[in-house]
Design a protein with these regions (language model features):
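Conserved C-lobe activation region of Hanks-type protein kinase-like domains
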Residues: 30, 73-120
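Short C-lobe core helix of eukaryotic-like protein kinase catalytic domains
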Residues: 1-12
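Intrinsically disordered, low-complexity regions enriched in proline, serine, glycine
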Residues: 19-20, 37, 47-49, 103-107
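Protein kinase subdomain VIII
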Residues: 52-54, 64-79
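Activation segment/activation loop of eukaryotic-type protein kinase catalytic domains
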Residues: 28-65
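Catalytic-loop of the protein kinase fold
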Residues: 11-29
């Protein structure tokens, strides 16, 4: 639940992360050990244009953005990221934490197309 609240905060600031994966979620220290923090905003992007007060226009990115294992199906298909894609990545992370692995993890080295097919 805490990770969803953190992601909601990022989205409320008009940003999408675009590279959610377990190594980008860290736990606090000392009295903050119960808090999860999302880090590494190197691939993040604004999804809301403050000048026009509109969502950014749809573009095909023509390439995978982020980690293939935890990225959304849209990312595998080269589509523009949105808030939904961050939520899909978070769902994969939660499944990974619960089960210890994802069904498509071994397919990563064989190509992104197989990973995308497995997710669909």
């Amino acid at each position: 639940m805490l990770k969803i609240c953190r992601l909601q905060f990022i989205h409320s600031r008009n940003f999408i992360h675009r590279d959610l994966k377990p190594s980008n979620i860290v736990m606090g220290l000392g009295k903050h050990t119960n808090f999860a923090y999302i880090i590494d905003f190197g691939l993040s992007k604004e999804f809301w244009d403050p000048c026009t007060c509109r969502h950014i226009p749809y573009n095909n990115t023509f390439g995978l953005i982020g980690s293939a294992t935890f990225s959304s199906i849209h990312s595998h298909l080269g589509m523009e990221h949105g808030r939904w894609d961050d939520l899909e990545s978070l769902a994969y992370i939660l499944i990974y934490f619960l089960c210890g692995s994802l069904p498509w993890q071994g397919l990563y080295f064989e190509g992104h197309d197989l990973v995308a097919e497995s997710k669909q």
